[in-house]
């Protein structure tokens, strides 16, 4: 019954045409923040709807505290080029990562305390992961629940982008009604509610039976939210043989695609050339979705 326009974040292109209009963006992670910033810069009246807590990491702080020793001009001067940095980063055991990451995010809390205080004052729901291990572990465990801040957090903190937390009750002709009865007028609703799973794409490209055979992709089996156990020891079904012969999964960030694509290519080439490629036994499938 909504009389305005609705789009998923994947279909949003620009805020140019929404100058002076009311726009509600449902979501509070990377896509939602980027879209809110674009809409605000183009003169829209923007409200972000946050339904659950989000981890915020300032880009500059993240690069300095977490990645500066590997990916920076200083690292290059120390002889650490991109290939070496990728190898070092990939060599860290996933089991050891949380203990290594927690102190980094404690430093981040101190350095950016003013931003976090202003966000919380604005009503923003913050978290640093279930165990305080921050962005990287959220990324590896679930691939969601965070925003790398390149400016939009300031817009939320000072109220230029309005914020409403809570669940949505329903959509009406001229906007959204929240569970607490608050009504948000909207000419446009952007649903920044995430993307489908890799399993979902397998089901679309092949069939559901194949998707179920491969099982859940991504995540470590940490037992945290959206990453059910048991512990896997490595990312589920990524860059290695799966339960479906000749179906390989490739994904992740730039570092992972640079580093692991070579290993996938070598495995494929070996099979084409008939070179034996003994590996550990195929991982058991514990989750279908």
Where do the model's predicted regions map?
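A catalytic-pocket lid/entrance helix-loop region that shapes and gates access to the active site
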Residues: 55-97
